[in-house]
UniProtKB/Swiss-Prot annotation:
Its EC number is 2.8.1.6. It comes from Pseudarthrobacter chlorophenolicus (strain ATCC 700700 / DSM 12829 / CIP 107037 / JCM 12360 / KCTC 9906 / NCIMB 13794 / A6). The lineage of its organism: Bacteria, Bacillati, Actinomycetota, Actinomycetes, Micrococcales. Belongs to the radical SAM superfamily. Biotin synthase family. GO terms for biological process: biotin biosynthetic process. This is Biotin synthase. InterPro entries: Aldolase_TIM, BATS_dom, Biotin_synth/BioAB, Biotin_synthase, Elp3/MiaA/NifB-like_rSAM, rSAM. Catalyzes the conversion of dethiobiotin (DTB) to biotin by the insertion of a sulfur atom into dethiobiotin via a radical-based mechanism. SUPFAM superfamilies: Radical SAM enzymes. It comes from the Bacteria. Its cofactor is [4Fe-4S] cluster; [2Fe-2S] cluster.
Length: 337
């Protein structure tokens, strides 16, 4: 006798609405996904994977990141060891142009198509903008790779400059839900982040705008964030999981439960069926090797390889080998410069 397979109404709804019609789940529907019991998780991940394959394709985008300026940031993002306001071991460091070119070459050698230049700042000053301009020029001369930037909040003039220099994609994360944001950042507002995101999109750059999960937000706030990101329609959403850093206000926050993280991955994919959903920081601790594999079979279709800004990531070879094992091709470079 064939055992009966239990089905959950929200997953049946998602199959019709998201998989077949390509319409993302609403905030209330996402809460239902995030509240699914553990026994429903395999079905949720399988459905999210089917959505990814149908609406995004089978290939996986690989990216590397490097920090041009580390530490000394004047903002008080409670999760970040680069804030100059906290007693963190991270100290201010600048990379010179040859080091950036070297990092871009190493990133390209992994098969990555995207290289992101990141700075720990509220927003870039003239010195930083000049450094970025020269770095972009040198990298374009020597490396065949798309260049992205993450330099904090921008003015319209800075947005226009970056677009003019050929920046392919700009990262500016919402991090968390609007309702939870004041509990983790007080030195700038949610609206200021949204303003930069809107200018980036209007200038024709691809917007990368993501989440940092596991900071103490509720399931409803995770759903709120996913819905807010879906409304923003970014090209890419990186999913970070809190890795509590010494000296920060969140240093004693426990790690997010791995199954909750996988539920979130499925939910974000069901909210945004056509968006690039990228594994970013913290997955090594929150999910480990097995969880990383499950996420790639549960909606993820992009990865950051190598190390992050102030923490160690999985070796690039481990992620690339996993993609081979899963028979997932790496997305080929399509230069936009």
């Amino acid at each position: 006798m064939t055992p009966t397979v239990h089905t959950w109404p929200i997953l049946e709804t998602a199959r019709t609405q998201v998989l077949e019609q390509g319409i993302g789940l609403t905030e209330d529907q996402l809460v239902e996904v995030l509240q699914l019991p553990d026994e429903a998780l395999p079905q949720a991940l399988e459905l999210a994977h089917q959505v990814r394959l149908r609406h995004c394709g089978e290939d996986v985008e690989v990216e590397g990141i490097v920090s041009i300026k580390t530490g000394g940031c004047p903002e008080d993002c409670h999760f970040c060891s680069q804030s100059g306001l906290f007693d963190s071991p991270v100290r201010g460091v600048w990379l010179d142009i040859p080091e950036l070119v070297k990092a871009a070459k190493e990133t390209a050698a992994t098969g990555a198509t995207e290289f992101c230049i990141v700075a720990a700042v509220r927003g870039p000053d003239i010195k930083l903008m000049n450094q970025v301009k020269f770095a972009i020029g040198r990298i374009n001369e020597e490396v065949d790779i798309n260049i992205a930037c993450s330099l904090g909040m921008l003015t319209q003039q800075q947005v226009d400059q970056l677009a003019g220099w050929g920046v392919h994609r700009y990262n500016h994360n919402l991090e968390t839900a609007r309702s939870f944001f004041p509990q983790v950042v007080t030195t700038h507002t949610y609206e200021e982040r949204l303003e930069t995101c809107a200018m980036v999109k209007a200038a024709g750059m691809e917007l990368c705008c993501g989440a940092l999960l596991g900071m103490g937000e509720s399931l409803h706030q995770r759903a709120e964030l996913a819905a807010q990101l879906a409304a923003l329609e970014p090209h890419e959403v990186p999913l970070n999981f809190l890795n509590p850093r010494p000296g920060t206000p969140l240093e004693n926050q426990g790690l997010m439960d791995g199954k909750d993280a996988l539920r979130a991955i499925a939910a974000f994919r069901l909210a945004m069926p056509r968006t690039v959903l990228r594994y970013a920081g913290g997955r090594e601790l929150t999910l480990g090797d097995l969880g990383t594999r499950e996420g790639l079979l549960g909606g993820i279709n992009a990865v950051i390889v190598g190390n992050y800004l102030t923490t160690l990531g999985r070796p690039a070879t481990a992620d690339l080998s996993l993609l081979v094992d899963l028979n997932m091709p790496i997305r080929e470079l399509q230069k936009t410069l």
